[in-house]
Amino acid sequence: MPCASIWWPYLPPPTASQRPAVSPSGHILTSVNILELLAEIIVPTVSGIPAEAHPGRASAKLAADPQHASRLLSHNAKVPINRLPGELLLEIFYVHKLSSALRIGLTHVCHHWRELALTSPLLWTAICLEDRVEFVDACLRRSAVAPLTIVSRCYIEDELALMKFIAPHIGRIRALDLRSLSTSAAEALMRQSRGSKASMESVTLHVHPGCRSLTTPTFVLARNSTRQLRSLSLGGIAIAAPSSPLTALTRLDLTDTFLASTATIDDILDLLENCPRLETLSINERCRRFPVKSKSADRRVSISNLRHMRLAAHTALISGLLSCIILPSDTTLEIKCLISTHGVSPASIRTVLPDGLGGLGNLAAIRSLHVFVSSNIFRIRAYDMVGSAAIKKLDMDFDNDPPADMSSMLPQALVELARSFTSRGVRDLQIVGDYGLLIEGVWREVFAHLPYIQHIEIGSRGTVNKLFAALLAPSSADATDPSFCRDLRRIYIRGAQLDVDSAARMSTLAANRLLQNRRLDTLALSCYQRVRWILHFQMMVKRSRLWVSRFQFREDWIFMRTLR
């Protein structure tokens, strides 16, 4: 802290609210008095002179004016930071224990905070290997025998230096987070952990992507070191089958873990069988030649506590894994299918999702399907209900390498998606893409597999004639079927290309559904030919004389609501 006599001339004059009060004895307590008093104690200490060499002068000042000393002590006692209980302060400190700068700053606020921080071993258990050696040594010393959390985000290549630091403290490490290891450093760490008595709660070990190969280090799940393991994240490191169930494991993250040529889908299933309390699972595999056939065709693994599952791999691996697992109803499933350009086909969805959705119990309550197709993007979302309170149950993307146009996948992919959810009671269907590619036959087959559809929303470009033609003239098998779109009530179309023929089809559709007691409540369109189209539509309404529509305008939308 600089001396007050240096900085005081440069400070602005105090305002009325900042002027010191005059005490009954006539002594004025100002910032200068406090700074000068502290300077006599702090400056000698900072300059290397022992603090005990000059406390006499400060003590003499306080002794000469007991009232001043009493007021100073009373003032310090009323300062908010000195009135907080030590237990509460420590809880606040622990929130920032991963920040080295904040921990150093805590010791420089006041004597009370410094004493509290230095005597709290748990505050110094988080060690970042990028910090200065002096600070790391101080953390190890101040943490005493408390469990350690070791973190590093930089590339670690020297295994000898890493082992020199890790080995003496391996027994009290509770969380290890090393995100960028060389292969040699990872292998040395694996050897050290096998023979140790470490009992970690969280392990994150990732080999740098540039160092990964088919010959990967192997992480052995020994019984003595995994009984408290709650979180495991491996990248570019193989994992051996556990010798006993991992009863405490709730989070598992595997990236390029099964690169070896001998890896099979049974290796994944064996691991999942030994994780009875698993809640979060993430598997990211870029290997194209992964054997996906299970030794037992009827093998099924139930993951009863799983809440979130994320898969990023090629379609064959995803399909093989989804056909062998049983998921609970409240699981959120995220899928990213990696497909090559020559592998782009409408059958991709049928390849990924098992027939009848298999054991994917989380998709049993799907009520809303969203499909988005644009250039090299093909995305599917599925929700458990319609509206803002809906919970996403399926999030599936197709990723081409290299990028390719997937618009041609829309017709058949939409049919395959409808087949997969044919018995799921889907009420809402939203499609964004070039629906001009969808012919009448495609629309009819989609509606035939979604008999409970109530709401259709379509975006992007295309003509609407084929959609209304399919609703007007179903196939011969569905012509007399009263369940064909019997619940359809609302149709929203954005960017539609409208003409006289479109107006005629829409008017006829509304009239027919009204006669069949399947009234279409709302038909909303957003188009550029609004005025011309309204004239066409009103003309068709007058000709039909079977139903009356109430027009509403909102921004660029036209709402037609049927009135009885």
Pin down the residues of each PLM region:
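Leucine-rich repeat
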Residues: 1-564
